[in-house]
């Protein structure tokens, strides 16, 4: 385990709630001040199938973009689905590689995970917490960006849902029920994410409404 629990909140995290809005648009959900946005999908996984992109899984039946909800592609009986409320490990590896080139503090990053999950590691439970929109209280961990995909559970593979470097150059945010992750930052960062061949990413806008699966009641 390399991510370490924070005993107190660093300024970039303690001030985070002041820089977030209280609405349901991408620009309000992620910190104000960033100018470009993307949505990255967790790949589809299921019994007997290899990981697939949403677009591949839809096979042309639905046009997949940054506004697509997973439930648009499948019915309730389907056992195939992307991971929910976490960042897929393969996606995390790619994101950490790309994001590293767009911050001055890649070894000094913060990772937030919802405190309501069962099975969290004992050291995670001892971390300081911060409140995000919609009453989401999040434990705060710190470490190198390359460790963002580290599991925060005693048994299981869930990783932190929010990432932010100490210089606040970008933000990665994923709600409790999200099957994807939103990213905000510079235009150069988002261009690099959209150009990556090993993740499924779509350009989002500040005014785009965060889709319903990201905020289930």
Regions inferred by a protein language model and the residue ranges of each:
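N-terminal low-complexity, intrinsically disordered segments
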Residues: 64-69, 74-75, 158-172, 208-217
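Aromatic-enriched hydrophobic runs in primary sequence
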Residues: 100, 114, 119, 164, ...
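Extended, low-hydrophobicity segments enriched in charged/polar residues
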Residues: 1-151
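Amphipathic protein-protein interaction modules
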Residues: 132-189
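Alpha-helical oligomerization segments
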Residues: 174-217
């Amino acid at each position: 385990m390399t991510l370490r629990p924070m005993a107190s909140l660093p300024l970039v995290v303690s001030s985070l709630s002041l820089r977030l809005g209280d609405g349901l648009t991408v620009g309000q959900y992620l910190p104000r001040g960033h100018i470009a946005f993307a949505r990255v999908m967790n790949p589809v996984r299921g019994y007997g199938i290899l990981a697939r992109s949403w677009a591949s899984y839809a096979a042309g039946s639905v046009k997949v973009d940054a506004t697509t909800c997973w439930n648009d592609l499948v019915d309730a009986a389907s056992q195939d689905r992307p991971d929910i409320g976490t960042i897929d490990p393969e996606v995390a590896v790619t994101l950490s590689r790309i994001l590293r080139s767009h911050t001055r503090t890649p070894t000094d990053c913060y990772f937030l995970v919802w405190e309501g999950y069962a099975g969290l590691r004992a050291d995670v439970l001892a971390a300081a917490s911060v409140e995000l929109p919609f009453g989401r209280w999040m434990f705060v961990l710190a470490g190198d960006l390359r460790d963002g995909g580290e599991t925060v559970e005693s048994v299981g593979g869930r990783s932190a849902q929010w990432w932010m470097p100490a210089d606040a150059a970008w933000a990665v945010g994923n709600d409790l029920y999200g099957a994807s992750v939103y990213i905000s930052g510079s235009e150069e960062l988002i261009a690099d994410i959209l150009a990556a061949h090993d993740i499924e990413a779509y350009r989002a806008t500040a005014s785009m409404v965060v889709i319903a699966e990201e905020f289930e009641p």
